């Protein structure tokens, strides 16, 4: 039996020798590689924090002491040493262990995360609650240098420093978020990592300046006058010191002894402390060390070779989006592309290679990305800002206030719309229809397949005013991509087939599910109208009302929440017209959706052929057909 099998709770770590800890670290890395190679997951971030996690749990007393993992995708080691070893093979599977901290899983998961830059705010909250309750415990936020580029992190640092809150921030600096970090903070941290001048004292520099013949004394005096600048040159972490934090580091994040020593030191400080830890993303697995971006969030792979297992499949919507945008940008130099630290995930890496001057990765800063795009538009460009649906939630005010209210020509590409699979509820994109369709001047569309996505992107760039375009994470339908692009009439749905008995309205790829269900209904004698809605805003009220009056029965199908979704919009149209004799069945989600394969999630919520047939039965469509035939 190895050492890992004997670790049931963090207290079991405290009696281990350093050679035993080194062996344990190897076992943990092997276990994570084994499980993630089968299930997929965030491998590289976790390989980089093994020693760091062990040190935290040896020095601090979880769950009494609160350890908060920013984003949370680097919490696998934490899960393995906090009593979830036996369930670890179910990581990210349907009904299995979450890939992120979840309060319902363990008392050691004190705060749920999934989006970045929230941990310091949470730590301040826990610390203030502790102080108000007169309790004695430590609060630790672990945040990566990528997440530190998020504005929310600095809001929390500012609050903690101003209030002198007794808490610890561990800056896990691996020089990467998902892709290579960008921005001034990244440059600043890089100087802390690499600049040997931090090891010199102010006196040594002044003495060196004085030795320069003729001008040395004057230079030393100039340096004295510029003491603030010199201080920034000489004192590591001064940015954090100026914000009210005691800065400790940088520390080798793979040196177990050094980590434990610095954490013990941090515990002695009764004011906010920032511990700067240097780690290697992907450490201990050669393929991941060579390509940490690929193994940041990876699907199943061959653990011997590191080769990702890919089945033959059509291109993804994301790939088609990125390629089409490049195609359009070749002809229009005004087209620019913006992303928030996700160039590869949003399909914009090809655009970045072809048009580097027109590509902007603003870091983990969705609010800035959207407002920046609005000003680009008013400056004469055609910005396309691509962000995951779940992260657009962070920029809602900017969408409303900076893009839509002044009618900016911004195309908002909403990637990962609908359920996304194994990453679970923090990453599902199932709220965007609800919060975007209420904006009066926003043209909001969703393609049924990858070819329609091309035409919608082309249409978006021809329109005057803000446009939102939502599409899923999955592969396309495998349809032919037409070369010639055309504009799609705004606010007009596509009637794919007509039938007198029931109307099926789908949005996005759910349209194909409606078509498949219509075939099954036909086998039962039910003739269905199938509508590809295309535009969520403005709605094709004319088509909705026409077929509602004809069939009296409607089923709406959407990969989205029911409340405020497309089905709700259809019912609003019917209500406005007073069509009380039309009955509607809405298929979608009515709760936070768990993790699992997309197909399993769709089936579980009735977004399937079987689900549509059951909805038709609830509408008594079959009984109506049987009644007509017996007359």
From Swiss-Prot:
Thiamine diphosphate binds at residues 73, 114-116, 146-147, 174, 285, 366. Signal peptide: none annotated. Keywords: Isoprene biosynthesis, Magnesium, Metal-binding, Thiamine biosynthesis, Thiamine pyrophosphate, Transferase. Pathway: Metabolic intermediate biosynthesis; 1-deoxy-D-xylulose 5-phosphate biosynthesis; 1-deoxy-D-xylulose 5-phosphate from D-glyceraldehyde 3-phosphate and pyruvate: step 1/1. Its cofactor is Mg(2+); thiamine diphosphate. It catalyses: D-glyceraldehyde 3-phosphate + pyruvate + H(+) = 1-deoxy-D-xylulose 5-phosphate + CO2. PROSITE patterns: TRANSKETOLASE_1, TRANSKETOLASE_2. SMART domains: Transket_pyr. GO terms for biological process: 1-deoxy-D-xylulose 5-phosphate biosynthetic process; isopentenyl diphosphate biosynthetic process, methylerythritol 4-phosphate pathway; terpenoid biosynthetic process; thiamine biosynthetic process. Mg(2+) binds at residues 145, 174. It holds the Pfam family DXP_synthase_N. It is an enzyme of class 2 (transferase). It comes from the Bacteria. SUPFAM superfamilies: Thiamin diphosphate-binding fold (THDP-binding), TK C-terminal domain-like. Binds 1 Mg(2+) ion per subunit. Binds 1 thiamine pyrophosphate per subunit. GO terms for molecular function: 1-deoxy-D-xylulose-5-phosphate synthase activity; magnesium ion binding; thiamine pyrophosphate binding. CDD domains: TPP_DXS, TPP_PYR_DXS_TK_like. Belongs to the transketolase family. DXPS subfamily. Catalyzes the acyloin condensation reaction between C atoms 2 and 3 of pyruvate and glyceraldehyde 3-phosphate to yield 1-deoxy-D-xylulose-5-phosphate (DXP). Homodimer. This is 1-deoxy-D-xylulose-5-phosphate synthase. It comes from Desulfitobacterium hafniense (strain Y51). The gene is dxs.
């Amino acid at each position: 039996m190895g050492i890992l099998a004997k670790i049931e709770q963090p207290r079991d770590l405290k009696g281990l020798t350093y050679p035993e800890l080194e062996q344990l670290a190897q076992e943990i890395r092997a276990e994570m590689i084994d499980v993630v190679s089968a299930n997929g997951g965030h491998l590289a971030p976790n390989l980089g924090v093994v020693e760091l996690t062990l040190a935290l749990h040896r020095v601090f007393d979880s769950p009494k002491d609160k350890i908060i993992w920013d984003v949370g995708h680097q919490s696998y080691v934490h899960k393995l040493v906090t009593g979830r070893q036996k369930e670890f093979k179910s990581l990210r599977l349907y009904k299995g262990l979450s890939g992120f901290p979840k309060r319902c899983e363990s008392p050691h998961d004190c705060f749920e995360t999934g989006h970045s830059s929230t941990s310091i705010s949470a730590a301040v909250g826990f610390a203030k609650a502790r102080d108000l309750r007169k309790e004695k415990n430590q609060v630790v936020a672990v945040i990566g240098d990528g997440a530190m580029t998020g504005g929310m992190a600095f809001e929390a640092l500012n609050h903690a420093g101003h209030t002198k809150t007794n808490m610890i921030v561990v800056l896990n600096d691996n020089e990467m978020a998902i892709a290579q970090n960008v921005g001034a903070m990244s440059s600043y941290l890089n100087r802390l990592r690499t600049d040997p001048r931090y090891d010199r004292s102010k006196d040594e520099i002044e003495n060196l300046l004085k030795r320069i013949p003729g001008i040395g004394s004057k230079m030393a005096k100039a340096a004295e006058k510029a003491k603030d600048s010199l201080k920034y040159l000489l004192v590591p972490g001064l940015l954090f010191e100026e914000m009210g934090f005691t800065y400790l580091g940088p520390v080798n994040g793979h040196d177990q002894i050094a980590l434990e020593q610095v954490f013990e030191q941090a515990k002695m400080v009764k004011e906010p402390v920032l511990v700067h830890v240097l780690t290697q993303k992907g450490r201990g697995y050669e393929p991941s060390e060579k390509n940490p971006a690929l193994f940041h969030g990876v699907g199943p792979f061959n653990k011997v070779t590191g080769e990702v297992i890919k089945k033959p499949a059509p291109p993804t919507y994301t790939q088609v989006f990125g390629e089409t945008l490049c195609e359009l940008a070749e002809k229009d130099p005004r087209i620019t592309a913006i992303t928030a630290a996700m160039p590869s995930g949003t399909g914009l890496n090809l655009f970045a290679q072809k048009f580097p001057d027109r590509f902007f990765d603003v870091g983990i800063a969705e609010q800035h990305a959207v407002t920046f795009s609005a000003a680009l538009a008013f400056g004469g460009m055609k910005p396309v800002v691509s962000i995951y649906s779940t992260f657009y939630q962070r920029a809602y005010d900017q969408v409303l206030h900076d893009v839509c209210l002044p009618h900016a020509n911004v195309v908002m590409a909403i990637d990962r719309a609908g359920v996304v699979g194994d990453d679970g509820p923090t990453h599902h994109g199932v709220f965007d229809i609800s919060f975007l369709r209420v904006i009066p001047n926003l043209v909001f569309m969703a393609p049924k397949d990858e070819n329609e996505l091309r035409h919608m992107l082309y249409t978006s760039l021809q329109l005057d005013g803000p446009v939102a375009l939502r599409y899923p994470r999955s592969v396309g339908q495998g349809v032919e991509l037409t070369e010639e692009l055309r504009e799609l009439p705004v606010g007009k749905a596509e009637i794919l087939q007509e039938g007198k008995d029931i109307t099926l309205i789908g949005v996005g790829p759910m349209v194909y599910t409606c078509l498949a269900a219509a075939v099954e209904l036909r086998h039962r004698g039910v003739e269905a109208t199938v509508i590809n809605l295309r535009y969520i805003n403005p709605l094709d009220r004319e088509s909705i009302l026409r077929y509602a009056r004809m069939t009296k029965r409607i089923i709406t199908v959407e990969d989205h929440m029911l409340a405020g979704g497309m089905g709700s919009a259809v019912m609003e149209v019917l209500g406005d017209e007073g069509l009380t004799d039309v009955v509607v069945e809405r298929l979608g989600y009515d709760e936070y959706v768990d993790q699992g394969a997309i197909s399993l999630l769709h089936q579980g919520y009735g977004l399937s052929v079987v689900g549509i047939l059951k909805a038709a039965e609830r509408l008594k469509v079959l009984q109506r057909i049987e009644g007509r035939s017996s007359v």
